[in-house]
Amino acid sequence: MSALSLAHGQTNLPDPIKVPSGHKLVLESVGVGEITYECRGKANAPGQTEWFFVGPKATLNARDGQMLGSYFGPPATWQAKDGSTITGTQLAVAPSSSGNLPYQLVKANPAQGKGAMTGVSYIQRVATRGGVAPSLACTAANKGQREVVSYQADYLFWATN
């Protein structure tokens, strides 16, 4: 993919999720989908429960609505329409506005397959809307219950200059 004009200025983003210098934006997408949560026992806190992030399922679209690929997990996987895929490791998160997923910076693993994901080294999640754990109480009475919440986020894919 050719380099795109930078629609999201790095200067307006929190420092922890800024992409290191020496990288260019190669793909910009709007992820629209759902995140599944499950009411589970809280780790290292006997008798307590919490909503646990199970995984995402989203379509990645261009600004004009053209479908570019998908995002799913676990593990967190971005797949282009051409079949190329990447997974990654979260490096940092930063707060977004109330009721929205945090911003995120992910270090990409080498792509599987040749295509749009080849050469991607970082993924940013910004402009988040929704996606946080359900407001429904998670208690011993509904342990094991799954809830699905809608979300939207911009996913920005970066490669070395």
Which functions belong to the PLM regions below?
Residues 5-9:
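Boundary at the C-terminal end of the N-terminal hydrophobic targeting segment
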Residues 1-3:
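Bacterial N-terminal signal peptides
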Residues 10-36, 43-161:
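Primary mode marks residue(s) on the alpha4-beta5-alpha5 output face of response regulator receiver
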